[in-house]
Amino acid sequence: MMVGICVFELHLPASRSLKDKRRVVKSMVERLHQRFRLSVAETDHHDLLQRAEIGLAAVVAEVGS
């Protein structure tokens, strides 16, 4: 079994409101989940206008060569 995690921080300079930021982050979270089947969530900076932190996690039962 293999577990992978990743946390990254985004700078969103075009975001003019928290509503803009939430729209961008939600879209990114949904696309990452659908395309790569990852667990994805906004993990920090919820109330900051132009910053977001995204966390990813994946578990693979069998690692192939």
Where are these regions (language model features)?
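C-terminal binding/interaction regions
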Residues: 21
